[in-house]
Structures are given as C-alpha cells and as structure tokens.
C-alpha cells in the first residue's frame, strides 16, 4: 500500500497519513445484530510510532463517537469524519483556482473561481461573470476531491506498534432467521434454518462475520451512516463452504460464527445455513381462546352465538440430547410445510417466535383451522353486590356468567380441542360439563373431544369477585 505523509524527527511524535481500501476487507470482523447495529473490528496493518499518529482511513459506516481501540497501549484521541466531496464543496475548494468548464456545445472555457455564494467568476478576457459558465471539470488532486468518505483519526501509542485494532459501532445491516419444518404424518418433522443478511449501508469483502441473537438496549440515537456505493462482490467463500455456523454464549447473547470469509453487497441479501437438517417430534393442538382475550372485556354479551377462531398450534419437542434440542434457536419466522397426495410440499402455516434457549420446546401458532370451528354464546349473566366478610367493611362486586361452546369437526378423524378461559384476580369455574384443568392463576382449559364429522358441546359457569 502506498504511504504518503511525514514523520517527525527528534520530537517523539510520528505523523502518518494512509488511505485504506474501500470495502470492509479481509482484516475485518463484523458482528451483526438484528436491530441494524454492526460492531466493526478492523486490524490496521500500519506501524504506529510511540506518541501521536494521524491516519486517514476509509472506515465505512463510521460513527466517530463509538470508535475506540481494544489495544491497551493505543488510545483514540480524536476522529473527524469527512464525507465524499459534493459539487458545492468542490467549488469552494477551488476558490482562487482556474477551473475548466464544459459548455453546451461541448467546447470548454477556463475561468477563475472568485466566489461560490454568490457565484463570481473571472473570465479569460478579464471580465467578471456572475453565473457558473458551464459544468466544471476538476483535477484529480489530493485535497481537492474526496471520492469516498474519509476518517481522520489521531491515535496515541504508549509504545511502538506494528499494527493495531480499531472497533466501532455502525448501522445499516440486519439479519433475520427463517426456519422450515416439513411435517410428517407420524408426528415427526425435519427442520432446517438459515440466516439472511440484508445490508443497506455497508459493502463487505471477505470478512469474518458473526450474527448476534439477543435483546440489547439502545441508549443513544444512531448516527446516520455514510453510504457506500454498491458494487459487485464475489461470494465464492460462502458458496463453497459446507460447514455451519458455530454458536457460543457471550454475556446474555448467543453469537453465531459463520464459516469462512463472507462477502455481501448493498441491497443484495445473503443467506447462510445455521445448522444441519434436524429431526424433531411435534404435537398439533386446536385452541379456542378465552372469552376475555377474544372479546376484549368481561361483561354481558349478545345472546346470539359468536364465531370464535380455532387456533392451530404446533409444539416442537426440544429435549436435551437431541440434535434440535441441544441448540439455542434465535427468534425468527417458522414456515410449516406438509406434503400433499402427490408428494409436493405445501405451505400450511407461518409464525414468528422469540429466542428459544436450548432444551425448551418451541411452540408456534400457524394460523386458524379450516375444518374445526367453534361458536360461543353467553347463556346467563348476573352481577351482584356481596357484603365483605367481617371485619372488612363494605361490599364487593360478584359476576357470574355462563357459556355454551359448540365445536364442529368436519374432518374424517376425531380431534381434541382446548377451550381456554382467562381471567385476572379472584375467579373460579363453579360448574362445567367437562372437568377444567388449571394452567395458571389466570388461565384454565377444557379438553373437549370432538368426533369425526360431528359436534361437541361444552357448558361452564365462571364466577369473578372484584
């Protein structure tokens, strides 16, 4: 790499100006977060003299406030970010210079720039022109035009260093995890997962890349990243790799190291597998949500039956000691597929889910049932004022409500439907045609069997004191 600049002699202070390559290259390691943050770690293969060193770097997407060196012998004492030169800045830099201008018919004329605002130019005949005489052509001189953003960084070194590491937090690259589960008829599924990287601001050429899954607070507004120009980048390193991401725990996050060196471009998504195909047992459930979550309130309802959704849930078993259970699963999207009679896979559901630690089952709602339907009607509602038990004074409100839920199954096989009831505070089910099962202090369920091509009816009464 060509170096330009000067070194101080006898002062113990070294000053070096150097320009690095445009894309984030092989000396770079990136940690990409799903919220758009990127931790950029860059090894600077430049000698640092003891004392002050000034570098001119190309650090794409730099937020100067976040720049630091993890090297204990090197401190960042200042960082100035200079954008690529626009036309107005180039004209201001040319004040006092003679610039060539291209006019309408393709001929050129030279004029001396006296002022930009207001425009003032001295023409070859000595006259002054108060309008720009054409499209300017600027000489490719250092200091006049910057073709890309540039960071001028001052580093203070306590000893001579042959290279140093710089770290900063950038923006504009996100990743998401998408999983595919092909459901078998025997309650077993094959699961695959991949991460897709999307860059809106950074080009990356042959870098080590980690994906970070976890919830991390953001305490400051991000600086707008300086955009890099898009360009073609080879991705052979990722394409030829047959390895999968390696996971480790760092703090309260999980970090996934992608295999090999990764290249990606602005606006060109890159997808890489997270883990080998795994097999997992699953359970399908039909769930009717409780009256309060479905209606949004607890009170008198219209006497006519209300159609309520029958939700379809899948629980993937992830016991320790299994290929799918031993790995933490970053939150993302689960796509569910099932084969038709011709063996073609059809999309039968899709759901978002949060980060799932190793050993914890993964439960997703894929949609609503087609052939299993439900209607709920409130058959009775009574509200009374009940005296409080002494020594408490006054009274409290007691609401008693009765419901009838009719379940219809148009399938050729019997199903079991979970009918849920959710309330807060002091409540109980005082009567029901099917025994309730307490799931928590706020939720109970009824497991109602429904015959093939038939119906089943559930009745129950809820009592709530408030």
Predicted regions and their residues:
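Short polybasic linear motifs
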Residues: 5-14
């Amino acid at each position: 790499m060509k170096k330009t600049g000067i070194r101080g002699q006898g002062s113990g202070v070294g000053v070096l100006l150097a320009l690095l390559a445009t894309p984030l290259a092989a000396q770079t390691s990136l940690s990409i977060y799903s919220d758009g943050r990127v931790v950029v770690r860059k090894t600077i293969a430049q000698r640092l003299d003891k004392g002050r060193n000034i570098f001119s770097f190309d650090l794409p997407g730099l937020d100067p406030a976040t720049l630091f060196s993890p090297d204990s012998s090197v401190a960042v004492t200042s960082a100035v970010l200079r954008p690529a030169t626009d036309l107005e800045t180039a004209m201001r830099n040319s004040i006092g210079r003679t610039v060539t201008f291209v006019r309408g018919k393709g001929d050129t004329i030279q004029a001396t720039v006296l002022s930009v605002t207001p425009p003032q130019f001295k023409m070859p005949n000595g006259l002054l022109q108060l309008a720009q005489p054409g499209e300017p052509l600027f000489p490719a001189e250092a200091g006049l035009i910057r073709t890309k953003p540039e960071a001028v960084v001052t580093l203070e070194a306590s000893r001579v260093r042959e290279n140093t590491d710089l770290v900063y937090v950038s923006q504009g690259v996100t990743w998401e995890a998408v999983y595919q589960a092909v459901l078998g008829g025997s309650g077993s599924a094959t699961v695959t997962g991949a991460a897709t990287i999307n860059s809106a601001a950074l080009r990356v050429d042959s870098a080590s890349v980690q994906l970070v899954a976890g919830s991390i607070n953001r305490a400051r507004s991000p600086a707008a990243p300086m955009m890099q120009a898009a360009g073609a980048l080879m991705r052979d390193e990722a394409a030829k790799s047959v390895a999968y991401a390696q996971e480790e725990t760092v703090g309260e996050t999980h970090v996934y190291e992608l295999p090999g060196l990764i290249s990606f471009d602005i606006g060109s998504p890159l997808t890489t597998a997270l883990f080998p195909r795994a097999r997992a047992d699953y359970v399908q459930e039909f769930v009717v949500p409780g009256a309060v979550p479905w209606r949004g309130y607890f009170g008198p309802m219209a006497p006519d039956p209300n159609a309520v959704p029958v939700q379809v849930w899948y629980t993937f078993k992830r016991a320790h000691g299994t290929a799918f259970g031993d790995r933490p699963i970053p939150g993302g999207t689960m796509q569910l597929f099932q084969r038709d009679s011709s063996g073609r896979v059809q999309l039968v559901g899709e759901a978002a889910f949060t980060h799932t630690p190793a050993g914890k089952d993964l439960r997703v709602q894929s949609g609503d049932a087609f052939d299993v339907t439900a209607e709920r009607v409130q058959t009775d509602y009574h509200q009374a004022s009940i005296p409080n038990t002494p020594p408490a004074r006054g009274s409290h409100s007691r609401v008693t409500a009765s419901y009838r839920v009719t379940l219809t199954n148009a399938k050729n096989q019997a199903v079991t439907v979970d009918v849920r009831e959710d309330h807060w505070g002091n409540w109980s089910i005082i009567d029901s045609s099917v025994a309730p099962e307490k799931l928590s202090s706020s939720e109970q369920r009824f497991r109602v069997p429904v015959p093939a091509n038939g119906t089943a009816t559930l009745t129950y009464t809820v009592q709530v004191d408030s």
